[in-house]
Amino acid sequence: KICHIPKHIKFDLIFLDGFSPQKCPEIWTEEFLSKIKQSLNHRGYLITYSSSAAVRKTLIDLGLTIYKIKPKIETSANWSNGTIAILNPYFDEYKKNSFLKELSIMELEHLETKASIPYRDPSFDCTSREILKKRKDEQLESNLLPTEVWRKKWHMTKAPFNS
């Protein structure tokens, strides 16, 4: 369990990739990602294949700077190969790495939709089903833009990933 990692142990790099947030929400909760952040060195990196708006928004809200991992060929269906989150990056650090790119306007707008509502498990004891239900309930009550409206605007009939 992440809660058992001693606070003095810090990592330069954490690769977090179990399953998508819809399959394994426990490792994508606001609380779990906060513990990940606390385990990073001063300029530590978190790398994941996830492009989920909920994950990206949570990382930003936790104070990490995020970039997308560029696919070889960008299309409307393949616009990101994942996310890199950096704690205290050097100014314009992404420009030195050909695999990193700032989020596009489309991706930034995605972070303003109901898809960006985080997964939550304050006590670290909820089941996947409970986490997903809490999030769905919060999405239903939210005044954020429905994700379907965002998808239509960007000509996406289906989500390229589970958000």
Mark where each language-model region is.
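Short "lid" loop at the C-terminus of a central beta-strand within the Rossmann-like core
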Residues: 20-22, 52-55
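A short SAM/SAH-binding and catalytic strip from SAM-dependent methyltransferases
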Residues: 12-27
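Residues at alpha-helix caps and immediate loop-helix transition turns in enzyme cores, especially N-
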Residues: 28-32, 51, 81
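Conserved beta-strand signature within the Rossmann-like core of class I S-adenosyl-L-methionine
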Residues: 13-15, 42-50
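SAM/dcSAM-binding transferase cores
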Residues: 83-163
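S-adenosyl-L-methionine
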Residues: 1-7
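Conserved Class I S-adenosyl-L-methionine
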Residues: 56-81
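A short glycine-rich, Lys/Arg-flanked "PGG" loop and its adjoining helix->strand segment in the class I
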Residues: 26-43
